[in-house]
Amino acid sequence: MDKHYTLYIKKDCPFCVQAREAVFRQGVNHTIYILDKKPKRLKELKEFYNYHTVPMVFVRENGMEKLIGGYTDLIAYFD
């Protein structure tokens, strides 16, 4: 089964821009959520996953979703 990546980003975050570009370069299935106008949702994600920076990158494979981390974690995951 194909992997699907989900990115939670903020527009003006340099690492978010780089993560977004990375999924486009890789040509992987992905969904991007821009959270600039959704501070409550961003706060919920940070608290639930105990991960306090953006981007927040997730991968879903075989029906299981896991947090990869941020931009550098995504690049390492692709390698």
Q: Where are the predicted features?
A:
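Non-catalytic, surface beta->alpha helical segment in thiol-disulfide oxidoreductase systems
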Residues: 59-79
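Nucleotide phosphate-binding site architecture
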Residues: 14, 36, 75
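Thiol-based oxidoreductase modules, predominantly thioredoxin-like and allied folds used
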Residues: 9, 28-42, 52
